[in-house]
């Protein structure tokens, strides 16, 4: 669970715990899904503002390989956040980025660097692996398939890339779905 410094400060100053909400943003959630989850759990949370901040008007991000000004999709860290019920969209985005930075500090990117991958590349590949693998045991195999296809310059041709391009998640893809370019 991610407990923001602001929340801790509020508790200390107030002398009692203010009203909070526990909001879980699961791995693999899109920006749209995350905005709906925040809005569902936080009264008055403006999902459209969250999408605008994280999608069209993102803050400066300190991630190697990330092109400033592009969507934060894939960078907003999935976790359970304990937040004030008055949380605003800009603060939600900041909390998720702080969680990303904190977790990236723990990751050894040595092999990625040897393969000329940026931190952003690794995050995108990890997102695809997370979306594609049904169980944890499949992750290394899925990662190997993705890596081999990238190395050979082949199209990925995995469900995760198609699901991302679709407006809504589908449990079962159709032949029409996989024809997407």
Whereabouts are the PLM-identified features?
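Conserved catalytic or metal-liganding residues and their short signature motifs at active sites
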Residues: 1-157, 164-167
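C-terminal soluble interaction/assembly domains
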Residues: 165-181
């Amino acid at each position: 669970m991610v407990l923001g410094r602001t929340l801790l400060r509020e508790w200390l100053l107030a002398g009692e715990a203010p009203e909070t909400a526990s909001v879980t943003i699961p791995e693999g959630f899109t920006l749209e899904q995350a905005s709906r989850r925040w809005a569902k759990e936080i009264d008055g949370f403006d999902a459209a503002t969250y999408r605008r901040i994280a999608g069209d008007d993102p803050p400066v991000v300190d991630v190697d390989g990330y092109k400033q000004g592009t969507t934060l999709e894939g960078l907003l860290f999935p976790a359970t956040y304990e937040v004030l019920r008055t949380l605003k969209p800009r603060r939600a985005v900041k909390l998720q980025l702080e969680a990303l930075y904190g977790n990236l500090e723990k990751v050894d990117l040595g092999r990625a660097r040897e393969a000329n991958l940026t931190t952003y590349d690794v995050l995108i590949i990890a997102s695809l692996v997370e979306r594609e693998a049904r169980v944890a045991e499949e992750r290394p195999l899925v990662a190997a398939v993705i890596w081999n296809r990238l190395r050979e310059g082949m199209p990925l041709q995995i469900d995760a890339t198609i699901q991302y391009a679709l407006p809504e998640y589908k449990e079962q893809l159709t032949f029409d779905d996989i024809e997407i370019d």
